[in-house]
Amino acid sequence: IDRQPMREAKERGELPVFGGPWFGGLEKDIVWVNSVRVIGDATNNRDLTHAEVQGRRDAFAIYEYLRDNVEGFEESRLQQTAPTIGIRETRRLVGVTTLTGDEVRAAAQPDDSIALGAWPIDVHPVDGHAGSHVMYVPDPFGIPYRALVPATTDGLLAAGRCISVDREALGTVR
């Protein structure tokens, strides 16, 4: 799909801010579209509610654009949206150590690695623009156990996007 007409439609105010869009699918005649970008503070219930509503509005607007303007989508229908909006980042643990983007790019292998990561560093702007900073990781990097251990609390381990990482490293480990 040629994305340039979509970018031009966004510039004319006919489409909301979007990323990509990226398309994929595993079944004949069914595609998924990853495109919606909504900003806000996901620790604030009002912002989160707004993001849920706005995200669905934007998904419908993008679907209608595809249906009306892209060959092959003329008889399509929107089957579903995600059950909840995806949250890229909120709070992160202050751990015994912090995995950094520099360590990711250097393919560091800490002595206490508990997993390997190799996903590209994908950081979205926080101001609502559609761009991304994507950097491919040349080699797998280690995720240290100490990044899961809080610096000041005993008997607790973190997992997922809340482990102790800087913003750039979060773009790959999340």
Which residues are covered by each model-predicted region?
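A conserved FAD-binding loop/helix module that cradles the flavin
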Residues: R167-R174
